[in-house]
């Protein structure tokens, strides 16, 4: 399971001209599901995302996690993160989870984060989305479990 996280000062997702998810300070999470992923991996990754210290403390050092920084999550499904780009000029998605598996783990990720008290906004699974953000830093990390 893959989470490409970006520290943002704001981010939003638009589908069919309507904003469906929007946050101020927090993390934009692009979430990719691979074939071997399961609930245990999802919980481990969600915990890592929420606990990862990417926000600056009073000394300017990246030392605060999402909760300590008072941030929110915007979680967007992103199956292309599971692409194999090692050969040729066209990505292969054979390692990506099935749509059913991906939807289940995406929704479970969101529910898990919400259950921990994190303000969690979302995109729309399998939709054509317009994602906009202001990357704060820029700070971007690729987390995998």
Curated annotation (Swiss-Prot):
HAMAP family the record matches: Deacylase_Dtd
Record note on domains: A Gly-cisPro motif from one monomer fits into the active site of the other monomer to allow specific chiral rejection of L-amino acids.
Record keywords: Cytoplasm, Hydrolase, RNA-binding, tRNA-binding
Recorded family membership: Belongs to the DTD family.
UniProt function note: An aminoacyl-tRNA editing enzyme that deacylates mischarged D-aminoacyl-tRNAs. Also deacylates mischarged glycyl-tRNA(Ala), protecting cells against glycine mischarging by AlaRS. Acts via tRNA-based rather than protein-based catalysis; rejects L-amino acids rather than detecting D-amino acids in the active site. By recycling D-aminoacyl-tRNA to D-amino acids and free tRNA molecules, this enzyme counteracts the toxicity associated with the formation of D-aminoacyl-tRNA entities in vivo and helps enforce protein L-homochirality.
GO biological process: D-amino acid catabolic process
Record-level GO cellular component terms: cytoplasm
PANTHER family, A to Z: D-AMINOACYL-TRNA DEACYLASE 1, D-TYROSYL-TRNA TYR DEACYLASE
Predominant cellular place of this UniProt entry's protein: cytoplasm
UniProt xrefs under Pfam families: Tyr_Deacylase
The name this protein goes by in its record: D-aminoacyl-tRNA deacylase
Catalytic reactions of this protein: glycyl-tRNA(Ala) + H2O = tRNA(Ala) + glycine + H(+); a D-aminoacyl-tRNA + H2O = a tRNA + a D-alpha-amino acid + H(+)
Localization annotation: Cytoplasm
Gene3D superfamilies according to UniProt: D-tyrosyl-tRNA(Tyr) deacylase
Assembly description: Homodimer.
EC number: 3.1.1.96
UniProt GO MF annotations: D-tyrosyl-tRNA(Tyr) deacylase activity; Gly-tRNA(Ala) deacylase activity; Ser(Gly)-tRNA(Ala) hydrolase activity; tRNA binding
Gly-cisPro motif, important for rejection of L-amino acids (motif): residue ranges: 137-138
């Amino acid at each position: 399971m893959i989470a490409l996280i970006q520290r943002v000062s704001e981010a939003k997702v638009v589908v069919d001209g309507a904003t469906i998810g929007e946050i101020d300070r927090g993390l934009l999470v692009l979430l990719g599901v691979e074939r071997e992923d399961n609930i245990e991996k999802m919980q481990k990754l969600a915990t890592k995302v929420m606990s990862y210290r990417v926000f600056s403390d009073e000394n300017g050092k990246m030392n605060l996690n999402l909760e300590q920084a008072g941030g929110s999550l915007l979680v967007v499904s992103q199956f292309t993160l599971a692409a194999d780009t090692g050969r040729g000029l066209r990505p292969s998605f054979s390692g990506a989870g099935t749509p059913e598996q991906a939807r289940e783990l995406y929704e479970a990720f969101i529910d898990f984060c919400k259950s921990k008290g994190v303000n969690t906004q979302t995109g729309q699974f399998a939709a054509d989305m317009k994602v906009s953000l202001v990357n704060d830093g820029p700070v971007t990390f690729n987390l995998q479990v």
